[in-house]
Amino acid sequence: MTRPVVTRFAPSPTGFLHIGGGRTALFNWLYARKHGGTMLLRIEDTDRQRSTQEAIDAILDGLKWLGIDWDGATVYQFARAARHREVAEQLLAAGKAYRCYATAEELTAMRDKARAEGRAKLYDGSWRDRDPSEAPAGVKPTIRLKAPLTGETVIEDQVQGRVAWQNENLDDLVLLRGDGTPTYMLAVVVDDHDMGVTHVIRGDDHLINAARQKQIYDAMEWELPVMAHIPLIHGPDGSKLSKRHGALGVDAYRAMGYLPAALRNYLVRLGWSHGDQEIFTTQEMIDAFDLPAIGRSAARFDFAKLESLNGHYIRQSDDHSLVTLLEDLLKYIPQGPAIAAKFDDSIRAKLTQAMPGLKERAKTLIELLDNAGFIFADRPLALDPKAQAVLTPETRQLIGRLRAALEDVSPWTAATTEAAMRAFAEQAGLKLGAVAQPLRVALTGRTTSPGIFDVLAVLGRDECLSRLADQSA
């Protein structure tokens, strides 16, 4: 009988949820959901100096924002140290591990000698079969695995294919340090086994770890999980992903105005493909996702593609939900509190009314908020340089006449204000554009905006007449 699928995401809380970590979590989540299994979350907090509660909170918050949920309680690796030590002692008792009394100076000399001779194996195994009675006084021993000396260690990886390491090149890895703390290699294996993990999906920078960890599985006679080591994310130029490329925390993408659904869609296509399909609903991702469809070569991060995809998701979004997303965004941007103070039911209603025109022009929520700025701007409007250039003395006189032409319009709608403006332009012998642009500048402070008659309708009669008065001669 096939075991139910159990995946896990196991970040180290030494910083934010990196974009690569977000993709790893997504792949684990998709695979578990596709197979009706579970995805577990383990915080690998054994590095006590670098692990912080702030980082843990950022990871949990980032996963929730991405829409990635996990099953069961979060497991904290450090809390399981006693169990890790227990397994090391089991291996010791079974003769599959040994105490190593090599001093720090001796280990340094061994490494230097091995490197000078071009050998991959840095530890010479001098305590492997040595009598502990020969131990020097005052040295706290480590516990090392008795790794096989000949043959090879093989992983049949779902992404990388068959990967083999010659055992003669692999050290007897340390399981317990001299102070009794378990190493990462041991802790990961024990936790994955005890948590019932069936599939380990992680970055291919962990591939060398897989060889070490398989040796522990073999020594304990435990079943090895299915392994899938996914390619790392590189910058557009093929170099290692850096901050200028997009090596940011998931929280930074939220603050830049990306939608969770758009980022999920973009991340799933980084290294995985399903024919030529680019846009996926979450359910389509779950249905289509499979490990063999992940490529081996590094995926390249492309901000332009992410922006384009995000723009698609914005245009497809419901107007009311976009207003909610805009309001939520304010918590994460520097100017947010000042704008949030202006949000009331009237502003929300105006934003919803303007949204059909606003969302066609925006690729991010930041752009959307910026384009909507005229709705909650304070009077008198701050004009951008292009708008200032439009407002000549003659234009200001024209704005005064426009205001007079609009004063008696009733009811105040996009259609009625358009009719009034067209009549004014015809009477004045002007093209509609010559009338619309000064009107746009006076009402929005910019030379670009949604349709000018939509702007008139959204702002309402009193606000429009007041803004026109501010800019008229």
From Swiss-Prot:
Sorted UniProt keywords: Aminoacyl-tRNA synthetase, ATP-binding, Cytoplasm, Ligase, Nucleotide-binding, Protein biosynthesis
Positions that bind ATP: 243
Record GO terms (molecular function): ATP binding; glutamate-tRNA ligase activity; tRNA binding; zinc ion binding
Cellular localization per UniProt: Cytoplasm
'HIGH' region (motif): residue ranges: 11-21
GO cellular component, one term: cytosol
Motif 'KMSKS' region per UniProt: ranges: 240-244
Catalytic activity annotation: tRNA(Glu) + L-glutamate + ATP = L-glutamyl-tRNA(Glu) + AMP + diphosphate
BP-aspect Gene Ontology terms: glutamyl-tRNA aminoacylation
PROSITE patterns the UniProt entry points to: AA_TRNA_LIGASE_I
Entry keyword annotation includes Electron transport: no
Bilayer-spanning residue ranges: none
HAMAP family found in the cross-reference section: Glu_tRNA_synth_type1
Purpose: Catalyzes the attachment of glutamate to tRNA(Glu) in a two-step reaction: glutamate is first activated by ATP to form Glu-AMP and then transferred to the acceptor end of tRNA(Glu).
Name of the featured protein: Glutamate--tRNA ligase
Organism: Rhodopseudomonas palustris (strain TIE-1)
